Design a protein with these regions (language model features):
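N-terminal capping/lid subdomain adjacent to the active-site entrance of alpha/beta enzymes
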Residues: 1-80, 85-103, 225
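General beta-strand structural signal in soluble alpha/beta enzymes
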Residues: 25, 54, 80-82, 109-110, ...
Length: 225
């Protein structure tokens, strides 16, 4: 924290002037037809989102088609992430993800059981350079410690409600900074989309001191329900 103190005022000015990059999952919900995915992806790009995320895991054939639709809509340079919501076994995840590599996914989120540290580590080794992200189901900093120190994940996804509040979040932010792991907080619910913005601002201003390789999640369509 003391190391970052000197640049905090400059970072505040930059944050006020330029904001913080964000991605959306609203473009890629399961059940959307191809035309809707393409339209929402283009809208997200035009609205200034830095990346989009698709849900995957129901059918490999469907995932190949949907990833192709999304990639064609956003172009080759915009990051495309995918989220399996814990649906795969470890070896199945590796095979499935290697089949989707042609679409250049930036990361795979929750590829398997959220408590399986060694499973995530094996997946990470088996699908590189695709990054592995998880953490929304982690209930405390100790489980995050296992994922981080075992080098089982590339991206730390804190869910501030599930982990039990700001003090526990701060512990994970500090741990992630120590091991140079970017934090992308989970925001898949009403209210969380607003909450995580503050967590990421804290991380940028006083903990990690950087926005490099970091974005916040915004899932706007959940506000409609």
């Amino acid at each position: 924290l003391r190391e970052q103190e000197a640049g905090t005022a400059d970072r505040i000015r930059l944050l006020e002037a330029r904001g913080y990059p964000a991605y959306t999952t609203s473009a890629g919900w399961l059940g959307y037809d191809d035309a809707k995915i393409a339209r929402l992806c283009r809208e997200a790009r035009d609205q200034g989102f830095s990346a989009i995320k698709l849900k995957v895991g129901r059918s490999l054939e469907d995932d190949v088609r949907r990833c192709r639709v999304a990639r064609e809509a956003i172009g080759p340079d915009m990051p495309l992430m995918i989220d399996a919501n814990q649906v795969w076994e470890v070896d199945q995840a590796i095979d499935w993800l290697n089949a989707l590599k042609r679409f250049d996914p930036f990361f795979i989120e929750e590829p398997t059981s959220p408590d399986d540290v060694e499973g995530h580590r094996k997946i990470r080794q088996g699908v590189a350079p695709v990054r592995v992200a998880t953490g929304e189901m982690c209930q405390n900093r100790i489980l995050f410690k296992q994922f981080i120190t075992r080098d089982a994940i590339d991206i730390v996804q804190i869910d501030a409600c599930r982990i039990g509040g700001l003090n526990e979040v701060l512990a994970v932010l500090l741990m992630a900074a120590k091991y140079d792991k970017p934090v992308w907080p989970h925001a898949g619910g009403v209210g969380l989309c607003e909450y995580v913005q503050h967590l990421s601002m804290i991380d940028y201003l006083v903990v990690s001191g950087t926005k490099r390789g970091r974005v916040i999640e915004y899932v706007d369509h959940l506000h409609e329900h």
